[in-house]
């Protein structure tokens, strides 16, 4: 048997918050702030956004390793946060997240039509998230009520390692029956999510305006002046640069043009690992 490059995409592996639902990725961010506040430790929205895309326990651990946050914790508890302390914050985070996830469950405007179009072109729709399964079950239920059902879902605690490891993306490849990782595109609004796709050997698309990096509501995004929007795009492109996404677009609504371009490149023999 001989190996031959795939000539077109077979699947899109999509993130959830900030990609398909929850424009601005507010659901997890606000809850991190509230969870730390219950331990009398102040964390700003901007700080909470920093590690977005990681599994939530890892996200909290990363926040606790920020020197300024560790010092605030030490002033309250007399020590810097241990893994047991991280787990205590995580165990408070979880019920808050489940309780309030519905507040930020709306589909990103235009996403459903975009994904319907991709399916008509024969693409399977996989998905993964930094949420654990107990939260994802609720997210999936709410999305279904709004008309979106992915072909497969992988939560962060359903694989040995979460992002930026490639396990969740690869679990989708296996479940969807895809025969080559180069026939997949990973779409995400965070650096860990792009690294996940890169390490899985996939094409990658970073979303600049709908997610964590811009951190605005749909209305706030639409209200930006042309000059401010361009300035923010440049800033966010810089944030993503080290993770080397193949494409950067504002929202998922621009994905069909990217899919068409990837298919052209695959047909010419290009592979994502070589770019």
Curated annotation (Swiss-Prot):
GO terms for molecular function: magnesium ion binding; phosphoglycolate phosphatase activity; phosphonoacetaldehyde hydrolase activity. Keywords: Hydrolase, Magnesium, Metal-binding, Schiff base. Mg(2+) binds at residues 15, 17, 189. SUPFAM superfamilies: HAD-like. InterPro entries: HAD-like_hydrolase_sf (IPR050155), HAD-like_sf (IPR036412), HAD-SF_hydro_IA (IPR006439), HAD_sf (IPR023214), PGP-like_dom2 (IPR023198), Phosphonoacetald_hydro (IPR006323). GO terms for cellular component: cytosol. Binds 1 Mg(2+) ion per subunit. Gene3D superfamilies: HAD superfamily/HAD-like (3.40.50.1000), Putative phosphatase, domain 2 (1.10.150.240). CDD domains: HAD_PHN. Signal peptide: none annotated. Its cofactor is Mg(2+). It is an enzyme of class 3 (hydrolase). It catalyses: phosphonoacetaldehyde + H2O = acetaldehyde + phosphate + H(+). The active site is at residues 15, 56. It comes from the Bacteria. Disulfide bonds: none annotated. Its EC number is 3.11.1.1. Transmembrane segments: none annotated. GO terms for biological process: DNA repair; organic phosphonate catabolic process. Involved in phosphonate degradation. Belongs to the HAD-like hydrolase superfamily. PhnX family. Homodimer. This is Phosphonoacetaldehyde hydrolase. The lineage of its organism: Bacteria, Pseudomonadati, Pseudomonadota, Gammaproteobacteria, Pseudomonadales.
């Amino acid at each position: 048997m001989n190996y031959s490059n795939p000539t077109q995409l077979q699947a899109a592996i999509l993130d959830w918050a900030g990609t398909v639902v929850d424009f601005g990725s507010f659901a997890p961010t606000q809850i991190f702030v509230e969870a730390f506040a219950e331990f009398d430790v102040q964390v700003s929205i901007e700080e909470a956004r920093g590690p977005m895309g990681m599994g939530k326990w890892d996200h909290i651990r990363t926040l606790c390793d920020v020197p300024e946050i560790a010092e605030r914790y030490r002033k309250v508890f007399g020590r810097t946060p241990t893994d047991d302390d991280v787990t205590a914050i995580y165990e408070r985070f979880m019920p808050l997240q489940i309780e309030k996830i519905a507040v930020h469950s709306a589909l990103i405007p235009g996403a459903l039509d975009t994904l319907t179009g991709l399916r008509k072109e024969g693409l399977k729709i996989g998905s993964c998230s930094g949420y654990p399964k107990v939260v994802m079950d609720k997210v999936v239920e709410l999305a279904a009520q709004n008309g979106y059902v992915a072909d497969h879902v992988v939560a962060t605690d359903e694989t040995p390692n979460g992002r930026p490891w490639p396990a969740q993306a690869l679990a989708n490849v296996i479940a969807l029956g895809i025969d080559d990782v180069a026939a997949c595109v990973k779409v995400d609004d965070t650096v860990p999510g792009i690294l996940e796709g890169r390490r899985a050997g996939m094409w990658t698309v970073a979303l600049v305006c709908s997610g964590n990096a811009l951190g605005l509501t749909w209305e706030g995004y639409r209200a930006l002046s042309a000059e401010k929007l361009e300035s923010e795009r440049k800033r966010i492109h810089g944030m993503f640069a080290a993770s080397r996404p193949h494409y950067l677009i504002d929202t998922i609504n621009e994905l069909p043009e990217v899919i068409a371009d990837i298919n052209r490149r695959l047909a010419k023999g290009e592979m994502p690992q070589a770019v």
